[in-house]
Amino acid sequence: MAELPQSRINERNITSEMRESFLDYAMSVIVARALPDVRDGLKPVHRRILYGLNEQGMTPDKSYKKSARIVGDVMGKYHPHGDSSIYEAMVRMAQDFSYRYPLVDGQGNFGSMDGDGAAAMRYTEARMTKITLELLRDINKDTIDFIDNYDGNEREPSVLPARFPNLLANGASGIAVGMATNIPPHNLTELINGVLSLSKNPDISIAELMEDIEGPDFPTAGLILGKSGIRRAYETGRGSIQMRSRAVIEERGGGRQRIVVTEIPFQVNKARMIEKIAELVRDKKIDGITDLRDETSLRTGVRVVIDVRKDANASVILNNLYKQTPLQTSFGVNMIALVNGRPKLINLKEALVHYLEHQKTVVRRRTQYNLRKAKDRAHILEGLRIALDHIDEIISTIRESDTDKVAMESLQQRFKLSEKQAQAILDMRLRRLTGLERDKIEAEYNELLNYISELETILADEEVLLQLVRDELTEIRDRFGDDRRTEIQLGGFEDLEDEDLIPEEQIVITLSHNNYIKRLPVSTYRAQNRGGRGVQGMNTLEEDFVSQLVTLSTHDHVLFFTNKGRVYKLKGYEVPELSRQSKGIPVVNAIELENDEVISTMIAVKDLESEDNFLVFATKRGVVKRSALSNFSRINRNGKIAISFREDDELIAVRLTSGQEDILIGTSHASLIRFPESTLRPLGRTATGVKGITLREGDEVVGLDVAHANSVDEVLVVTENGYGKRTPVNDYRLSNRGGKGIKTATITERNGNVVCITTVTGEEDLMIVTNAGVIIRLDVADISQNGRAAQGVRLIRLGDDQFVSTVAKVKEDAEDETNEDEQSTSTVSEDGTEQQREAVVNDETPGNAIHTEVIDSEENDEDGRIEVRQDFMDRVEEDIQQSSDEDEE
């Protein structure tokens, strides 16, 4: 291999060479490829395409020309970077779903919202749109600078006159080296109104500009959620705008619904969006969708139909789709454009200021051009006027001249004419010597003088020039302006909360002794008569049992108060929904409990900010405290201190009050004290309370509740052996806080110690939970009303080693009650046939007849009997559901 001459080798440091070469490449990409000019909103490739269309005369009133011809001409003259990049840029300018105001009028297949590519350039045709003419108007009147093309054989515009603000009207996107731009499209009417306001008030604020320019206006319409993202983008040049599809929920007969999507967010691929929905349905991440189809057509426009199952909540499904699919997405605004050839981040006002300055420059240069042309013409007309005034001498001079050159010199010398004037006289036809032509020349001359005066006035007075810019912008607005397509919805839509995705329904949250938690729909538990065996509420682990239960809405807050005096918070829907037989999940997976900490009370609250509500605390040692509910509105995931007390004490219960209640505190030895809540001074969140009741030896607090001063409520007492009774609240006199209380029940071996003391109205249902995990739901009104000293009546039949662990009130809901005969039950015999057994009456219990369901079986123990009944009830429910589905079909 021959060695290169030494003179052709330049030694350079590789670091310097890489730095300089990369910078040259980066600047080339930034300036000459990826970023739009702030003045006309175009990248070089788009500018060259439009100029090429103009040079080829492909105006809207001319016929379409092959795209291949356009691309070839642009590539050969101005853009030597490959035909595909030119054609792709032209295709995008022709897509009405990509450009708010398309700049190319395409004929043929130019792609679709489903991501389909355009047909090959040999098949499609194109020409300019009408609005494109406004980008190029006056380009031949010295309004902009021209530069050499890549090989120096052609001239191309450095920028277009851009008689409307194209940068913001159609937006722009591009990725350069180390930077990127993403500018949303806007409504032309609003933009021009904004420019007009800016021209009248240069000190206008962004907020004032937003009175004219509401926000982006996307070609695919859709919705924008809130204005905070828009305002941030307009003020800083950067921001995120939440876009959402337009969807409606329609009825489709038979109680069924469908979701119909008619507009989708800008730049969303419709086909991929539908695929994403189908994928979520297939993976069971979204439930309740039975059918999904695309009914989009030229006649109907975008129409995506999502059929919803009859028992599903269409609104919740739609919110899930918003959160998990491109039905809702964001547009990241990054307004970077070339300003004086340099990339710069600009805000809304800066973009309009630069555009307005460009228009003033265009109009000024056009005026100067027109003035030059007018003066040149006036100069010629002055020569013609001289010739007409001396026509005989002019003719004589010309006839005496041997050549054109001699004639021109003679005319210049004899009549003091310029070369152009002399040439115009020589070029003048004889017919212009008539009197009529003389009048025309005189009229044209006078008209030109007036025109020159107007042009000079424009150039001399900046305000006159600015008014001319306003008038021309107004004319464009009136011709091409339209109504905005994208609707801006005001409100707290920027962040879709989890709560929006969850249907609001009544639920039951259970907590086991070993701290396993779950939630179930409240309808899981059917109302039964007293003495029933109940249904299996959960399958507990060995030595575990349900200890607490609370009813609330999925959207309510749940406050968890622990024996250590701490408080934690969850939303109802944040507790996992599991099956009735499931044991639940460890509560430490939901809230961050400390060591040796267990939940003592769960309270459902709708509004934690309420200033009218209080929380009353009671500890095992008889200490009480009252604190404002608002003190607990902000609780971290790791909890906060709710009450302070001695090491040998622990929190027993907490109640929500209105501030005007009577406080009831009950003990395991059946003592109860009642005193006004007003005697408790509100204390801070971490404060220690005061003495609420004086306890006897071996006694401890087991219950805390509230009642109104003249309440007709009753005190419900339930003992550990399943007995209970109701006693009017007014049977318990008011006393001073800190007393020993009065007797509320007679405690014997038969009924056991008190496990629950609470107030009832008689209109609730009662849920009684045993240590075996059995739950029974019964009507409080069915419980006998007895005096304070009574033992109570049997509420639930307990097996050996069973006891009542907790009791909870449930709002009565007729829809949850079954229509089955509660006085009989069915069992399954060995041959599979159902046998009907009569209920027996428990004569041990006084009062009204108590219907008790008893299943005798030699092969099953008590747990087995419960399982047999549960299996049968599950199959009955399945049969009922199947019959209902068949009827619907």
From Swiss-Prot:
Q: Which organism does this sequence originate in? A: Staphylococcus aureus (strain N315)
**Gene Ontology biological process terms, A to Z:** DNA topological change; DNA-templated DNA replication; response to antibiotic
Protein family per UniProt? Belongs to the type II topoisomerase GyrA/ParC subunit family.
Which reaction(s) does the protein catalyse, per the Swiss-Prot or TrEMBL entry?
ATP-dependent breakage, passage and rejoining of double-stranded DNA
UniProt-listed Pfam families: DNA_gyraseA_C, DNA_topoisoIV
Provide the top EC class: isomerase
An example of a GO molecular function for this protein is: DNA negative supercoiling activity
Q: Where is this motif: GyrA-box?
A: 528-534
- The residues responsible for catalysis, as annotated, are 123
- Residues annotated as signal peptide: none
User: Briefly, what is this protein's role?
Assistant: A type II topoisomerase that negatively supercoils closed circular double-stranded (ds) DNA in an ATP-dependent manner to modulate DNA topology and maintain chromosomes in an underwound state. Negative supercoiling favors strand separation, and DNA replication, transcription, recombination and repair, all of which involve strand separation. Also able to catalyze the interconversion of other topological isomers of dsDNA rings, including catenanes and knotted rings. Type II topoisomerases break and join 2 DNA strands simultaneously in an ATP-dependent manner.
Spell out the subcellular localization from the entry: Cytoplasm
- State whether it acts alone or in a complex, and with which partners, per the record: Heterotetramer, composed of two GyrA and two GyrB chains. In the heterotetramer, GyrA contains the active site tyrosine that forms a transient covalent intermediate with DNA, while GyrB binds cofactors and catalyzes ATP hydrolysis.
Listed SUPFAM superfamilies: GyrA/ParC C-terminal domain-like, Type II DNA topoisomerase
Additional detail: Few gyrases are as efficient as E.coli at forming negative supercoils. Not all organisms have 2 type II topoisomerases; in organisms with a single type II topoisomerase this enzyme also has to decatenate newly replicated chromosomes.
Gene (UniProt): gyrA
Can you name this protein?
Answer: DNA gyrase subunit A
Q: Which residues form the Topo IIA-type catalytic domain?
A: 35-501
Cellular component GO terms, alphabetical: chromosome; cytoplasm; DNA topoisomerase type II (double strand cut, ATP-hydrolyzing) complex
Comp. bias (Acidic residues)? 813-823, 876-889
The EC number(s) attached to this protein equal 5.6.2.2
